């Protein structure tokens, strides 16, 4: 690809009077590359050869004057050179490992392909895209930025000292990560799936650029599929509700409080309980207390995930589930579980593409959106999800999504029965959901958000 963008080429026109845009860009690129590697070429005694080789090529194309003009322009215009260097600098994407069943690594591949599609240079940490380089080899070169997906490594001192931006998609509640965000500067962009996570990081760690940018989904080509043998599917694990993790009376009170207030965040619940008990503590003690409640909070998540499914199963609604964790389900309606082998990411997309309804229960993301929601919408199924502030704002209930309230789960079985009985309603919602998700919630959209931020 040409190093010069259209605006840079136009700037060159103003100097040279050239009207052939493609040719002008070509020779501006050659001139830029000469200046970029001038020190190395000089050191190896090859600069003169390179200049004459390019001049000979320009002569053969009848463009000698153009080449000379572009070379002089780039040699004498440091501002133009710097602009092109910034515009053509690569992103460095941290690919990660197979944590979370490979989902985070999948995200890294998705954003990489979207950036390349948009004309960006990309280097990946595993060498799967771009050139294979060591970080030590690029430290002194300009990067447009690092991109990671909950990449803890980007918070190490080595990266903190680097001046380029670090764009880090963040999915889990920051309360689980202690002081990881302490002392980060304005080169860090925390792209949180939940607005409350961004506010938490900003409030307690002083982050300047914590904002909401949820993950996106993949269109695997299933939206038009009419053969949907699965009525309602849930792709997720069956987790234990283990009340033995509750260590003292205060933790028990907190646990019971959150069970009866399922629409607030963990930190909101703690603040309310402290006010109710007339306890006044400083910020550090609050964070320490919240940190001590991690296991209790996970228990609350597991309690409501189980309760959502149990509500449907007990009402006689069959649910297709995947993975051997469901062998331990002992709640009501267990005979209505249809158990299958575990599935990977690609198989999950196919399952949703063969389903009428995809069920989603949040991991306590009260103002967020997950890739599961986007993937269900892009698969042609109806996404039936626990409501969040983000979904309330960005989607329309019974138009392109169907949401339910954890405080009123008694209504959920009738919602499912209506969707399964009313083909036209279900298909209309699914179609609208696909249109919306394909316009707003694919990785091309997230890549564009990062580029606009630059």
Residue ranges of each PLM-predicted region?
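Non-catalytic N-terminal targeting/anchoring module and adjacent flexible stem/linker
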Residues: 1-105, 110, 114-118, 122, ...
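Active-site regions of enzymes building and remodeling cell-envelope glycoconjugates
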Residues: 3-18, 163-167, 187-189, 207-211, ...
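Extended catalytic core of nucleotide-activated donor transferases of GT-like folds
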Residues: 4, 80-81, 94-204, 218-223, ...
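Short, charged, surface-exposed secondary-structure boundary motifs
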Residues: 6-9, 24, 175-182, 200-204, ...
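Hydrophobic/aromatic beta-strand patches that form the interior of the parallel beta-sheet core
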Residues: 13, 123, 147, 167, ...
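Nucleotide-sugar donor-binding catalytic core of glycosyltransferases
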Residues: 45, 50, 57-90, 94-107, ...
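Catalytic binding pocket for nucleotide-activated donors in carbohydrate/polymer assembly enzymes
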Residues: 93-95, 106-118, 123-127, 183-185, ...
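A short, gly/pro- and small-residue-rich
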Residues: 159-173, 250-259, 372-380
């Amino acid at each position: 690809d040409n190093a010069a963008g259209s605006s840079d080429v136009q700037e060159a026109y103003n100097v040279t009077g050239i009207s052939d845009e493609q040719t002008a860009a070509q020779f501006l690129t050659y001139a830029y590359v000469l200046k970029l590697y001038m020190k190395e070429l000089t050191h190896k005694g090859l600069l003169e050869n390179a200049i004459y080789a390019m001049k000979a090529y320009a002569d053969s194309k009848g463009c000698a004057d153009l080449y000379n003009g572009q070379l002089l322009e780039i040699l004498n215009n440091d501002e133009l050179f710097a602009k092109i260097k910034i515009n053509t600098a690569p992103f460095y994407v941290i690919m990660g490992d197979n944590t979370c069943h490979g989902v985070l690594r999948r995200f890294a591949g998705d954003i990489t392909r979207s950036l390349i599609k948009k004309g960006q240079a990309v280097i990946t940490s595993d060498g799967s895209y771009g050139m294979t380089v060591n970080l030590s080899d690029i430290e002194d070169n300009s990067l447009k930025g690092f991109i990671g997906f909950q990449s803890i490594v980007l918070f190490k001192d080595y990266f903190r000292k680097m001046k380029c931006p670090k764009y880090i998609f963040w999915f889990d509640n920051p309360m689980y990560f202690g002081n990881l965000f302490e002392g980060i500067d304005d080169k860090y962009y925390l792209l949180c799936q939940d607005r409350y996570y961004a506010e938490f990081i900003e409030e307690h760690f002083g982050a300047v650029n914590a904002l909401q940018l949820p993950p996106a989904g993949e269109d695997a080509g299933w939206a038009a599929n009419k053969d949907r043998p699965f009525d309602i599917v849930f792709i997720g694990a069956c987790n234990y509700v283990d009340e033995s993790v509750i260590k003292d009376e205060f933790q028990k009170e907190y646990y019971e409080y959150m069970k009866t207030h399922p629409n607030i965040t963990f930190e909101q619940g703690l603040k309310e309980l402290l006010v109710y008990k007339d306890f006044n503590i400083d910020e550090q003690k609050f964070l320490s207390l919240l940190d001590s409640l991690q296991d209790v909070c996970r228990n609350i998540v597991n309690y409501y995930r189980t309760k959502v499914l149990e509500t449907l199963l007990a009402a006689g609604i069959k649910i297709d589930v995947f993975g051997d964790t469901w062998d331990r389900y002992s709640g009501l309606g267990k005979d209505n579980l249809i158990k299958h082998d575990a599935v990977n990411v690609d198989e999950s997309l196919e399952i949703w593409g063969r389903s009428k309804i995809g069920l989603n229960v949040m991991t306590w993301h009260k103002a967020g959106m997950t890739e599961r929601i986007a993937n269900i919408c892009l698969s042609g199924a109806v996404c039936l999800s626990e409501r969040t502030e983000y979904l309330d704002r960005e989607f329309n209930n019974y138009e392109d999504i169907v949401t339910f309230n954890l405080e009123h789960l008694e209504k959920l079985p009738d919602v499912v029965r209506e969707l399964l009985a009313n083909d036209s309603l279900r298909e209309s919602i699914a179609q609208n959901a696909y249109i919306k998700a394909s316009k707003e919630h694919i990785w091309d959209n997230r890549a564009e958000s990062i580029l606009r931020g630059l």
